[in-house]
From Swiss-Prot:
Keywords: DNA damage, DNA repair, Hydrolase
Species of provenance: Clostridium perfringens (strain SM101 / Type A)
InterPro entries in the cross-refs: Formyl_transferase-like_C_sf, MPG, MPG_sf
Keyword Endoplasmic reticulum: no
Name listed for the protein in its UniProt record: Putative 3-methyladenine DNA glycosylase
Keyword Signal part of the UniProt annotation: no
S-S bridge residues: none
Gene Ontology MF: a single term: alkylbase DNA N-glycosylase activity
EC number assigned by the record: 3.2.2.-
Family assignment from sequence similarity: Belongs to the DNA glycosylase MPG family.
Transmembrane segments: none
Amino acid sequence: MRLGRDFYNRDTLTVAKELLGKVLVRNINGVTLKGKIVETEAYIGAIDKASHAYGGKRTNRTETLYADPGTVYVYIIYGMYHCLNLISEEKDVAGGVLIRGIEPLEGIEEMSKLRYRKNYEELSSYEKKNFSNGPSKLCMALGIDKGENGINTISSEEIYVEDDSSIKEDFSIVEAKRIGIDYAEEARDFLWRFYIKDNKFVSKK
């Protein structure tokens, strides 16, 4: 079942935790790709010095952060790598959840071609280990770039998230510091990164 607006229109920390175990769906090149979300990070606009919208900042780059809950926010890091976020809370609040890691479930051959331009069976153990265990890695595997920025996952067939009862499992959630935000003063110590314990597609344990 596809996640609706009510799922995203809640506290960002709650959304970030409850996205774990859900399935990210991407339709591209006539193929359906699916991955279980195993790692997320929460960012809460006005109060979070690690957020692009800290202090209510609004620019052309960050405007999507203020969009309807369930909207896709894609930004670029290091001038070349993309990161996928899902907007949470009410419109104009600027809450968002960064998807940091997925466990491939369906369409792995297509993901491999998008990620490495090779068939999956040709990948080295190192390449398989680093398939989708990081925000930019999963964007490459799913063919996500700035062209997907602003997509509404509530109605789009290109990208959405579903709750698939057939893959439900019990798991423990680890709460940890977010990664790569040492500039964010006290916010760098917030335990706003969440991941499924012992899952091999988590970027950093």
